[in-house]
Amino acid sequence: MVAELTEFQKKRLENIKRNNDLLKKLQLQGTANKIKREAGVDTVSRHEERLKKKKKIVNAKKQSEKEASPKTAMPTRRSRRLMGQQVKNEEGIPNVSDTQLLKMNRNKELEDLKDIKETAVIGDVKLSDLIKTEEGSNEDELLAKFKQFANKNFSSGDFFDIIKKRQKETENDSDLTKMQEDFDLHMYDVFQPNEIKITNERITSMFFHPSTDKKLIVGGDTSGTVGLWNVRDEPLAENGEDDLVEPDITKVKFFTKNVGKIECFPTDTSTLLITSYDGSIRTLGLKDLKSADIMTLRNSYEEPLGISDCQFSYDNSQVLFLTTLGGEFTQLDLRAKPTETKFWRLSDKKIGSMAINPQRPYEIATGSLDRTLRIWDVRKTVETPEWSQYEDYHSHEIVSTFDSRLSVSAVSYSPTDGTLVCNGYDDTIRLFDVNGELPEDLDEKNKTVLKHNCQSGRWTSILKARFKPDQNVFAIANMGRAIDIYNSSGQQLAHLTTATVPAVLGWHPLKNWIAGGNSSGKVFLFTDELNTSK
């Protein structure tokens, strides 16, 4: 039973009702809560507080259940790289990204090929072991191909007897017109020059075999590859039978750097001598197609010395004169077993060219990167040369010197009239009269100066003037895409145009034939024979 309200309680309820009605009329019902919010007083209701407390209790209970459940121990991940540890790869898979792994697989063959290219041929080898065709190597076929160049008719001094006879002839022919007619040469046309690629890279040396019945041109390039072109003189059939015939070219890689010089032995023209910038000296026999390793030129520290030029002595056909990329000079007797080599210093920088005076075989001329042309007497030794900054080797006596404005690229002697030609980066060709006693300043013996663009640049081999072995005529490539031929007086005899720059030249020693090699390994051949028709 509910107790009745007292008068005081009734009066209190009436006051509350009256106050609420008044607030409604004044629209101030939410003012108190608003004032609390502005004052920062918590206005959360007790109901809401109870809900929050209940939620906390439930979460705490769940957390305690999780901690009570058994947990599997997991290792903490750490970076071995940051810890400085080496990762052991037991499966042999490189620790690289997928993209890098694909690149590695793609370039593996190229890297293997590069390693092979950088590996030099050591010891005596057969060409058939180094040359592989689609059908494999065929030694009998290779021997048959070069058999005619191994004929004994071209050995035992016969070749040099012919040249000696030509050298003794007095050249009284002053008819310039006749000489120009003799060197009005025709370009070989059985194959086009862009088909005659005898090497893979830029040609650095050329050699024309002295055989007159059949032409053989040998070239070397910057990669150490030697190419032999067995020239076809017969025209191609017009009925289409020879449409698929290609130039007969054999390539073999002997060295790891530039092929510096290719020559044949004076007493046996069936054997070639080849030198390289990697210091190697090898022979190549055309009879058996075997290559013998003569030696690798090294200094006292067993470091290989790149061979820049070489020539057989006129006094002894078994002695080889050599110059190096470091400015050294030496003489090698090829009959003796390789022993410690004795060097003389002729320059503090690279010797780019060397030539022996045929009238005085004890005199040699050198053209160097130090901007000098010097003539030396190799019979006399100077212990401490004043001009050199080095004290490692003795030197020879200087006979005469010409100081050039820029480096001297080439030197070459005429066979009979005592003319020395040199050219260099000063865009000139200079002819000197070296007959008789020479003054200290070779410029006093200057015969003539020809303007010529000799600056070949990076992608073209250095242009070098070279005298023909049996005539007082020299040739030099032209940056205007031609071969220029002059006599020893500086009169121009021919201007043989080509499609590209035939930077490296090779004269035939007996015939008016000349070949030039360009920067892509291709050859331009000019002869005095009438062109054949395809």
Swiss-Prot record:
User: What are the protein's UniProt keywords?
Assistant: DNA damage, DNA-binding, Repeat, WD repeat
> GO CC annotations?
chromatin; cytoplasm; nuclear periphery
Classification via PROSITE patterns = WD_REPEATS_1, WD_REPEATS_2, WD_REPEATS_REGION
- Determine if Repeat is one of this entry's keywords: yes
BP-aspect Gene Ontology terms: DNA damage response; regulation of DNA damage checkpoint
Could you tell me where the Basic and acidic residues compositional bias lies? 39-51
InterPro entries in UniProt? WD40/YVTN_repeat-like_dom_sf, WD40_repeat_CS, WD40_repeat_dom_sf, WD40_rpt, WD_repeat_DNA-damage-binding
Q: Does the keyword Cytoplasm apply?
A: no
User: Which stretches of sequence are listed as region Disordered?
Assistant: 39-80
Q: Where are the WD repeats?
A: 198-239, 254-294, 346-386, 403-442, 457-496, 498-534
Q: Which SMART domains match?
A: WD40
Q: What does this protein do?
A: DNA-binding protein that binds to both single- and double-stranded DNA. Binds preferentially to UV-damaged DNA. May be involved in DNA-metabolic processes.
Q: Which PANTHER family match?
A: WD REPEAT-CONTAINING PROTEIN 76
Record's family? Belongs to the WD repeat DDB2/WDR76 family.
Spell out the protein name for this chain. DNA damage-binding protein CMR1
Organism, by scientific name, is Candida glabrata (strain ATCC 2001 / BCRC 20586 / JCM 3761 / NBRC 0622 / NRRL Y-65 / CBS 138)
